[in-house]
């Protein structure tokens, strides 16, 4: 059995601590102050797995796409982000990305209802001509762990530095048919973590939430047990955030709801406190911006 001496561990920890004190970030920022703070201060750390979960229409895919756009803006030439979409076409995802990045209504892009300035700003801007080149967008209805591992190894072989991997949605991943679905998902997450540690990238996954939340008496706030195939998922990840929009869910203490509000409720934080994060969403442009409050719960 291999072990690491306490002195070595202390040396590593103080090296990281000195970087944090000096303001050197070890993680990859989400673009949202409150989310980064909840994740430990530096954003998404390599080797860690974060889940954004919610019922259909709540915005789990939307928050993952907004984080993706924010991170694309920060990439160096050799760095890439991987986004695997299992439910939407790559065309739909790209349209949503363009709407977020350029703050243009999604229906204008979908219907071609753009003025000359809007069209030129997209075609000639640095986002489409440079930053978007760092996106590896994969459309697959049921990718397997082997598919993802092959993609990772091929990108590294090409000299790319992978900063993050996003899977939307976790439940659509193909798992070993000889075991239960939740066991298969847990095994897949375990193997992805190994690759994430080896190649130093973070993992973001979106997850479905059981319909039983809709029929629950009282506040309809999901719990870890409401994650689909949840028996082992919650044990295998580091952070779980449930995405809620008060106009759909009853939130305790809120008599009036604002239609552009979005809440991230942290139900698992392996390394810190649970938080409630308020964000603001514009569904026309698909853009999510920082809210006003950050509350420890």
Which residues does each PLM region occupy?
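Helical hairpin unit composed of two closely spaced alpha helices linked by a short loop
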Residues: 163-202
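Cytosolic-facing regulatory segments adjacent to core modules
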Residues: 36, 74-161, 277-278
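Conserved H-loop
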Residues: 86-88, 201, 206-208
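Structural motif
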Residues: 51, 137, 163-168, 241
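C-terminal regions of RecA-like/P-loop NTPase motor modules
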Residues: 2-12, 111, 128, 145-165, ...
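Helical mechanochemical/support elements of P-loop NTPase systems and associated helical scaffolds
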Residues: 31, 63, 89-93, 118, ...
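Flexible beta-alpha connector loops of hexameric P-loop NTPases
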Residues: 107-114, 136-140, 174-186, 215-225
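The Walker A/P-loop phosphate-binding site
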Residues: 2-104, 125-127
């Amino acid at each position: 059995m291999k072990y690491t001496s306490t002195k070595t561990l202390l040396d590593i920890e103080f090296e990281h601590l000195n970087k944090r004190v000096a303001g050197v970030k070890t993680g990859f920022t989400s673009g949202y102050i409150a989310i980064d703070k909840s994740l430990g201060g530096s954003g998404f750390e390599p080797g860690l797995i974060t889940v954004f979960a919610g019922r259909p229409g709540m915005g789990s895919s939307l928050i993952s796409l907004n984080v993706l756009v924010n991170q694309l803006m920060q990439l160096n030439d050799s760095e890439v982000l991987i986004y695997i979409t299992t439910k939407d076409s790559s065309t739909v995802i790209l349209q949503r990305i363009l709407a977020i990045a350029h703050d243009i209504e999604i229906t204008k892009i979908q219907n071609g209802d753009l003025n000359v300035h809007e069209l030129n700003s997209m075609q000639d801007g640095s986002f489409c001509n440079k930053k978007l080149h760092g996106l590896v967008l994969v459309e697959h209805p049921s990718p397997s762990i082997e598919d993802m591992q092959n993609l990772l190894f091929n990108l590294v072989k090409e000299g790319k530095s992978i900063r993050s991997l996003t899977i939307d949605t976790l439940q659509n991943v193909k798992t070993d048919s000889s075991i239960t679905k939740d066991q298969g998902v847990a095994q897949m997450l375990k193997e992805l973590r190994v690759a994430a540690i080896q190649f130093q990238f973070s993992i973001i996954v979106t997850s479905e939430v059981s319909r039983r939340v809709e029929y629950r008496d009282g506040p309809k706030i999901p719990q870890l047990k409401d994650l689909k195939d949840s028996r082992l998922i919650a044990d295998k990840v580091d952070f779980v955030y449930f995405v809620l929009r008060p106009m759909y869910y009853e939130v305790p203490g809120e008599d009036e709801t604002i239609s552009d509000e979005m809440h991230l409720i942290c139900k698992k934080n392996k390394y810190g406190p649970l938080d409630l994060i308020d964000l603001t969403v514009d569904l026309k442009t698909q853009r999510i911006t920082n809210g006003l409050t950050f509350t420890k719960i």
